[in-house]
């Protein structure tokens, strides 16, 4: 196990194209960090720099307080699990898992001991003689993880390992990875674009946007107190409703197109009064037929136990996530107009209109 540190790490490609704008972060021994963000945000580039597959333009990456910028990948004592498994098709499961150890010229008895131990952890014991083509997608990914485990590295790197799996298998493999980490407690860095993976796996998550870490925190910190409108709109399904509003000195709120919101001034903090800001409301923290604003229903999504009600209020689209029972008590059809508003039990979110950052002190 090991610590992992980033000291003002930057990456610029040829032509002075910046990809990573400067990251400072410390990963504790045994911590599971998930880097999440949309395509092109720099998350995989950051992981590749840790692995030694990309050079660091500026700053330092340290493993156990040792700068590794100039070390070859093989010298960093890390193991990486890829999205596409990267298995040798002509080798058995055993040989795929043992290959890296053979290259390092470990004794045969030690190799067998490590492979069989990893196979037991991952429930691959009966599959060691099979070739990859005879395995399911989930089994192949477990072999890829087994190949990383047998190396007994200081740091695990996971590069979108579940992206090629179907939805049901992704859920199962998330649980496998959670159990694996609890058992091995190895420092881990995990890259994904999937917020569900980030929320369920991470001790802390790094939300990346355009090469910048927008927010670093525990999953619940990020969910309950997003640092920016980007984070608010990226974490949460459906994402947070964001409305451009003008707040009067008396706490009365109007949308940017002049529609009054029937919200108690007591729910409006002093920091936003007399200003133009962005107000955020989580869909699951809103109610139908509640004080707030009138919205015309444009679409209703039925998800079994839940309903997603999409309504338009002027230029803003607003989504309410409610139980099917609550929805049945408020029968509504597309084209109807309903009042929707906050449930009063959860605070509203407020962001700066110009920067998108969370209003300080809130």
From Swiss-Prot:
Q: Which GO terms describe its cellular component?
A: ATP-binding cassette (ABC) transporter complex, substrate-binding subunit-containing
Sorted alphabetically, which SUPFAM superfamilies does this protein's record hold?
MOP-like, P-loop containing nucleoside triphosphate hydrolases
Which subcellular locations apply to this protein?
Cell inner membrane
Molecular function terms, GO-annotated = ABC-type glycerol-3-phosphate transporter activity; ATP binding; ATP hydrolysis activity
Q: Where does ATP bind?
A: 37-44
Pfam families assigned: ABC_tran, OB_MalK
Do you know which NCBIfam families this protein is assigned to?
PRK11650.1
- Which family is annotated? Belongs to the ABC transporter superfamily. sn-glycerol-3-phosphate importer (TC 3.A.1.1.3) family.
Listed under subunit, the entry gives: The complex is composed of two ATP-binding proteins (UgpC), two transmembrane proteins (UgpA and UgpE) and a solute-binding protein (UgpB).
Q: What is the protein named?
A: sn-glycerol-3-phosphate import ATP-binding protein UgpC
Q: Which organism is it from?
A: Bordetella bronchiseptica (strain ATCC BAA-588 / NCTC 13252 / RB50)
Q: What is the lineage of its organism?
A: Bacteria, Pseudomonadati, Pseudomonadota, Betaproteobacteria, Burkholderiales
This chain is encoded by the gene named ugpC
């Amino acid at each position: 196990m090991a610590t992992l540190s980033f000291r003002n790490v930057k990456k610029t490609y040829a032509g002075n194209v910046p990809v990573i704008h400067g990251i400072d972060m410390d990963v504790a021994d045994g911590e599971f960090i998930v880097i999440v963000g949309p395509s092109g945000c720099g998350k995989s580039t950051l992981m590749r720099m840790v692995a030694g597959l990309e050079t660091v333009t500026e700053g330092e990456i340290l493993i156990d307080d040792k700068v590794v910028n100039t070390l070859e990948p093989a010298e960093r004592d890390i193991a990486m699990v890829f999205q596409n498994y990267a298995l040798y098709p002509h080798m058995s499961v055993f040989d795929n898992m043992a290959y890296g150890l053979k290259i390092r010229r470990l004794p045969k008895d030690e190799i067998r001991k490590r492979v069989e131990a990893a196979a037991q952890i991952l429930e691959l014991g009966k599959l060691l003689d099979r070739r990859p083509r005879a395995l399911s997608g989930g089994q192949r990914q477990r072999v890829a993880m087994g190949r990383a485990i047998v190396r007994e590295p200081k740091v695990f790197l996971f590069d979108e390992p579940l992206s090629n799996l179907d939805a049901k298998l992704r859920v199962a493999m998330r649980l496998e990875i959670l159990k694996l980490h609890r058992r091995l407690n190895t420092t881990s860095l995990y890259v994904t674009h999937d917020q569900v993976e980030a929320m369920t796996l991470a001790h802390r998550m790094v939300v990346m946007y355009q090469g910048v870490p927008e927010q670093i925190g525990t999953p619940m910190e990020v969910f309950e107190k997003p640092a920016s409108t980007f984070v608010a709109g990226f974490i949460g399904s459906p994402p947070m409703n964001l409305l451009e509003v003008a707040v009067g000195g008396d706490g009365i709120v109007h949308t940017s197109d002049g529609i009054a919101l029937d919200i108690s001034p007591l729910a409006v903090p002093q920091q936003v009064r007399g200003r133009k800001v962005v107000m955020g409301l989580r869909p699951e923290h809103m109610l139908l037929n509640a004080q707030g604003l009138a919205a015309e229903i444009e679409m209703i999504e039925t998800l079994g136990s839940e309903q997603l009600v999409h309504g338009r209020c002027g230029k803003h689209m607003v989504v309410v996530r409610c139980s099917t029972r609550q929805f049945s008590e408020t029968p509504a059809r597309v084209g109807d107009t309903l009042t929707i508003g906050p449930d009063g039990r959860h605070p509203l979110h407020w962001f700066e209109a110009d920067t998108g950052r969370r209003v300080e002190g809130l």
